[in-house]
Amino acid sequence: MPIQITFDEQDELASDVLVVALPDHLNQLSTLTFQGHNLTELLDTYKQHHIISSEVGKVSSTRFNENGLDVRLITVGLGNLKELNRARTMEVFEKLLQTLKGNHITSADVLLQSFASKAIEKIEIAELFSLQAKKALYHFNNYKADKRVPYHLNLKIHGAEADEVTAIKDGEIIGEGIKLARDFSNIPPNILTPEYFADMISAHFEETSVEVEVKDAETLQAEGFGLIHAVGKGSEFGPRLITLTYQGADDDSAPIALVGKGITYDSGGYSIKSKLGMQEMKFDMCGSANVLGMIEAAHRLALPINIVGVIASAENMINGEAMKPDDVFTALNGETVEVLNTDAEGRLVLGDAVFHASQYQPSVILDFATLTGAAVAALGEDKAAVFKNNSDAPLEEITKIAGENGEWTFELPVTETEKHLIKKSEVADLVNHTNGMGKALFAAAFVMHFSGNIPQLHFDIAGPATTNRNNFNGPKGPTGYLIQSIVDWLRQEIK
């Protein structure tokens, strides 16, 4: 583990490094004291002499040695507290943590109270700090020959009361859910086949409160999952449908359904991708990995809620058995689908998965998929597109929470036009592709067609599921996008 957090109700140092936050105006904070020293006066003096800075995210370091307290004082700027929010706070934590790592500091004491203000309470700061530590210090080197010991940081938190200690532990759990999603997403596709993916999921949740059921290729074909089977039959590694159930509430409480696209590798099939387009297609299962992260956090937090998770996993490859343009397959709901583009496979597996989830009579279905380049073209690489099928879907609640967390989601419409287009086949009930514009809207209409009247939100995370640069949420690669926000929403639903 890259980080270990301990607590201390006393002012006993575990290291020679003391971390304190510094706002523009110290009178915005209550007086800070440590071991009898008035740190507010000290910080103000150092700030006036430009020894330390309150600029947002600016990390400063100086030595303090007075009356028996001899520490390396590290401050991180908070800027104007009136402009401070959750997303900016997480950026501040990332700058601090990366500075500690860059300076090879392996142990530090943190004065929690210094980060709290009227803008963000201490209990919220506590959870965000531990969560961001897990995210920002994420490390994955499982397939490198040089097994260097990863950076490890011991943090001792001062001033955390009982509810704040709980918040810190909750933040760690959510962070570990994000780590789980990132770890799965980083596994190379020659290893993470649908079968291996299903086996790993079953093993991970063994002896937990999450039950796992796996359907193999033969079972999928026999039970009528025609779309998942069609996508996966071009690979020697057959498709899998993984259903996870978490029962945290009474049996009569309707579950929330979380559905994930789990294409462990996408060549495009006979509608083959270019050589550049094929790179990083191992990440076409990030939607399913993120669903796993959400369920991991929910069950470890023991949320009093019922969840059904559905992961449709397949490889979209080419052989003599693979689906072809013009093929027609029968979906689980009994409708036929004409395949015009084999690279529009994600919506096919999601169609069967969403209908399967609907059989559990959930209160809402949320699906997550790296589905269309059109969503990236519309919104950029750092934002997710979200679509709703009716007014009962919790769009406003989730987008508000996500925005506060810096996980930007923006609604795109599904209109009668798209609902008509998906039925524009001469030979089948539905068609999986359009040659016109609005491809993200078309794909969303197709996926949400299978939920019937059950409220559904479809998240197209093709852009932010991965990042090609280091940012405040951690290193480049898979991000675990929306895990934090969906878990926050689940907790809000309980309240």
Curated annotation (Swiss-Prot):
One of its GO terms (biological process) is proteolysis. Its main location: cytoplasm. It holds the Pfam family Peptidase_M17_N. Its EC number is 3.4.11.1, 3.4.11.10. PROSITE patterns: CYTOSOL_AP. The active site is at K273, R347. Mn(2+) 2 binds at K261, D266, D284, E345. InterPro entries: Leucine_aapep/pepB, Macro_dom-like, Peptidase_M17_C, Peptidase_M17_leu_NH2_pept, Peptidase_M17_N. GO terms for cellular component: cytoplasm. It is found in: Cytoplasm. Its cofactor is Mn(2+). Gene3D superfamilies: Leucine Aminopeptidase, subunit E, domain 1, Zn peptidases. Keywords: Aminopeptidase, Cytoplasm, Hydrolase, Manganese, Metal-binding, Protease. Binds 2 manganese ions per subunit. Mn(2+) 1 binds at D266, D343, E345. The keyword Transmembrane does not apply. Coiled coil: none annotated. It catalyses: Release of an N-terminal amino acid, Xaa-|-Yaa-, in which Xaa is preferably Leu, but may be other amino acids including Pro although not Arg or Lys, and Yaa may be Pro. Amino acid amides and methyl esters are also readily hydrolyzed, but rates on arylamides are exceedingly low; Release of an N-terminal amino acid, preferentially leucine, but not glutamic or aspartic acids. GO terms for molecular function: manganese ion binding; metalloaminopeptidase activity. Presumably involved in the processing and regular turnover of intracellular proteins. Catalyzes the removal of unsubstituted N-terminal amino acids from various peptides. Belongs to the peptidase M17 family. This is Probable cytosol aminopeptidase.
